[in-house]
């Protein structure tokens, strides 16, 4: 079972089921992706190393808010925990959130996995998105993009109030040569409007 398959199976447990239409591997990101596969707008958002929160704020001209859906210790399959503990130390906390520019339609659905031992040192204000917290700490970090996906999801069509397909990405954030979190983000098409 692939690492991404483990993440996908875990999200099904969270009632976020999806069908994968296309997967871009990391070697594609450095060569460049043809605009026939992904238009330049989505390439900019998906491949950018900067703060997604700040990019959304500029695009929407509104403050980006986070809605915490759930934060809890994970209790999943041995293979999923085994995959997570390769980069992230146990015990592991899973966070599910939406990012909004208003209270009506979410822009992003995200799931992240953190070591319980480090999560509080990176979240000065848990009401703010991850990138706002990391910026407040004034630390250098690296986003290690692993995959870009195009997916269909009936459950997210309801949440986003938009028809799919949806772009998504999965990456690790590194700090001081150690991975601090794994993040999976799914983008609403409303971002481009």
Curated annotation (Swiss-Prot):
Pfam families: Rv2949c-like. Disulfide bonds: none annotated. Keywords: Cyanelle, Plastid. It is found in: Plastid, Cyanelle. The keyword Plastid applies. GO terms for cellular component: cyanelle. It comes from the Eukaryota. InterPro entries: Chorismate_lyase_/UTRA_dom_sf, Rv2949c-like. Belongs to the ycf21 family. This is Uncharacterized protein ycf21.
């Amino acid at each position: 079972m692939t690492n991404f398959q483990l993440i996908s199976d875990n999200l099904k447990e969270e009632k976020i089921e999806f069908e994968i239409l296309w997967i871009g591997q990391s070697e594609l990101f450095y060569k460049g992706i043809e605009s026939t596969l992904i238009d330049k707008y989505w390439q900019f958002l998906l491949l950018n190393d900067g703060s997604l929160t700040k990019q959304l704020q500029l695009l929407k001209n509104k403050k980006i808010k986070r809605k915490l859906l759930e934060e809890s210790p994970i209790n999943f399959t041995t293979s999923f925990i085994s995959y997570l503990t390769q980069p992230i130390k146990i015990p592991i906390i899973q966070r599910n959130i939406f990012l909004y520019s208003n209270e009506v339609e979410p822009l992003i659905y995200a799931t992240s996995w953190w070591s319980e031992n480090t999560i509080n040192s990176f979240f000065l204000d848990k009401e703010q998105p991850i990138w706002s917290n990391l910026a407040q700490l004034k630390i250098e970090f690296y986003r290690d993009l692993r995959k870009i996906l195009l997916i269909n999801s009936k459950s997210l069509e309801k949440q986003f109030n938009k028809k799919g397909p949806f772009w998504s990405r999965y990456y690790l954030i590194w700090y001081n040569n150690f991975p601090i979190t794994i993040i999976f983000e799914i983008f609403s098409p409303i971002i481009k409007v």
